[in-house]
Amino acid sequence: MGFVPITLSAGQNPLTQFDGKIETHFLEPPAGTAFQIMQIYKPLPKGDKSGAYRGPPPHFHLHQTERFKVIKGRVGIEVNDKVTVLRPKDGVAICPAGNIHRFIIDVDPKHDQDGEDDEEEDDGEIVFMVNATDSGKDFVLDRIFLENWYGVRVDSFKYGTKIDFIQQCATFDGGDHYLPFPATLPEWVPMSWSVAIRTFLGFWVTVIIGRYVGGLLGYQPFYREYTTDWELAVAKMQGTWFYRRNVQTAYRAATSWKELREMVPYSDEGAANMGLADAKVGNGAAVKKAINDRAANNGEDKKNL
């Protein structure tokens, strides 16, 4: 059996998680983008970093360019192992498709080349925006992916101790979001070669574990408990046999609660008594009387004919 969601978060906007430490506001995507969000990260108590989600693991997108803009505070943007600290005055940071990257909320001060107001920035909330281009593919970084990835990580950390790796790969596969192969190449290998090799291997590891192995074991990238636009999520998963086999669509035939309440009953107690309204279990006389009355009525009907 695959992963089973616990949290019900479909339709929530903003999406509030980790006891209010993170808010994700889904905004109307600008033309040509697959999504746009504004996230608010509340400051953590000193030393309270464990268990709080403060940024994704290193990853890459094959078909989408991602953009970041800080509204308040500062955020570290790591691209191919190089970290840049982004502030409101710095405008938009762009990460082209194919690059290994992540954003870092609690960025290490050693990466900051412009350290003014460090203490004030560290103590305040962080607000920043993210969007990505729309590649037109079935599996893209969009609201459906974000709702499910955020749902998986909350259920994993709140009700467990770690994220199911197969589920992580399946969800990442559904969002053009792949885990790079570990950086094990010698330092003399050019960065461009290293990125190309790590992304090639990382893509296939993510797809093989998430889609092929996970799909056969009952995993899927998206779950109804997390997903606002479930019909689109189903359409995405039906594009590959490995996920399609785990998706069922009987819910489309369901009658709404309003219609159920307004339905006229098509049966009554008489149906349970086979039309003998006066019949009582164990009351033979009443049954005989009901049968005789019915026979008499049938006789009258024949005379009338």
From Swiss-Prot:
Induction: Expression is positively regulated by the oosporein cluster specific regulator OpS3 that binds the promoter at a 5'-CGGA-3' motif. Expression is negatively regulated by the global transcription factor Msn2 that binds the stress-response element 5'-AGGGG-3'.
Pathway assignment: Secondary metabolite biosynthesis
Superkingdom assignment: Eukaryota
Keywords: Oxidoreductase, Virulence
Changes seen on gene knockout: Impairs the conversion of 5,5'-dideoxy-oosporein into oosporein.
Gene3D superfamilies listed in its UniProt record: Jelly Rolls
The EC number(s) this enzyme carries: 1.-.-.-
Oxidoreductase as UniProt keyword: yes
GO function terms (MF aspect): oxidoreductase activity
Enzyme class: oxidoreductase
Role of this protein: Oxidoreductase; part of the gene cluster that mediates the biosynthesis of the bibenzoquinone oosporein, a metabolite required for fungal virulence that acts by evading host immunity to facilitate fungal multiplication in insects. The non-reducing polyketide synthase OpS1 produces orsellinic acid by condensing acetyl-CoA with 3 malonyl-CoA units. Orsellinic acid is then hydroxylated to benzenetriol by the hydroxylase OpS4. The intermediate is oxidized either nonenzymatically to 5,5'-dideoxy-oosporein or enzymatically to benzenetetrol by the oxidoreductase OpS7.
Family: Belongs to the oxidoreductase OpS7 family.
Name of protein: Oxidoreductase OpS7
Species of the source: Beauveria bassiana (strain ARSEF 2860)
Designated gene of the protein: OpS7
